């Protein structure tokens, strides 16, 4: 107990809770009951992790993804095991993060999503908050991309709730120069990794409509005939011969 109470690392406490919950499930299956020390230690670890949440606002870029994933896990623990954990204390800590304008962007997006999922923010207000945050970050694409990553860890469905969000994301990307775009690309890719194939398809349709292009052209899935392939190969061969003639290659 003293070791758990003295632990000051958020990630370690979240991993401990996960291990204790796994152990509790195994005991329940094997013995039909759970040793009382397990929920006691889990509560101590949860309490310690919740106390640390407001301090996560200064999380570094190197730590933010791991911290946010553990924060998502802690949220899951709080909702799935309400008889064990103080859900209100957790949500209160989340609100403290949102009330601090200097919070880490990814963590802020995640906490905003948690508050929405718990019904503490109406969908219209939630979408307005997202759009406003992204609009204010158009000149800081890295910050916007990090925010999107945190947001989509829990509330990716909001992308389909209000077309303004997709439009602002598009403006953030369009505003970035090539070097900046390559910098934010890993975050943008990661943000969409949790989307289901059907959601990706739906998103593709929305983007195609927004840019007024066909979905096939957008995704690169245009059907090409054998004749067109043969003609392209012929032209490629001619181009290669011309380059040799001109001693360019």
Feature map (PLM): residue ranges:
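Extended repeat-based interaction scaffolds and adjacent low-complexity, acidic/S/T/P-biased segments
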Residues: 1-249
């Amino acid at each position: 107990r003293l070791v758990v109470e003295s632990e000051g690392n958020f990630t370690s406490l979240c991993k401990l809770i996960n291990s204790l919950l796994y152990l509790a499930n195994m005991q329940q299956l094997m013995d039909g009951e759970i040793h009382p020390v397990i929920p006691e230690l889990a509560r101590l670890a949860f309490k310690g992790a919740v106390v640390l949440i407001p301090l996560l606002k200064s999380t570094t870029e190197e730590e933010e993804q791991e911290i946010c994933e553990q924060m998502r896990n802690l949220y899951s623990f709080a909702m799935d095991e309400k008889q064990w954990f103080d859900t209100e204390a957790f949500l209160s800590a989340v609100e403290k993060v949102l009330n601090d304008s200097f919070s880490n962007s990814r963590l802020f997006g995640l906490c905003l999503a948690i508050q929405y999922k718990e019904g503490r923010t109406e969908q219209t207000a939630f979408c307005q908050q997202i759009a406003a945050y992204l609009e204010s970050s158009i000149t800081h694409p890295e910050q916007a991309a990090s925010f999107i990553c945190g947001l989509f860890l829990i509330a990716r469905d909001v992308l389909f709730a209000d077309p303004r969000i997709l439009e602002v994301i598009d403006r953030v990307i369009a505003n970035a120069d090539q070097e900046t775009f390559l910098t934010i690309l890993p975050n943008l890719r990661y943000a969409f990794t949790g989307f289901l194939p059907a959601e990706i398809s739906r998103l593709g349709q929305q983007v195609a409509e927004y840019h007024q292009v066909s979905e096939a052209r957008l995704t690169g899935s245009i059907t090409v005939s054998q004749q067109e392939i043969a003609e392209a190969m012929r032209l490629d061969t001619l181009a290669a011969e011309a380059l040799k003639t001109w001693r360019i290659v």
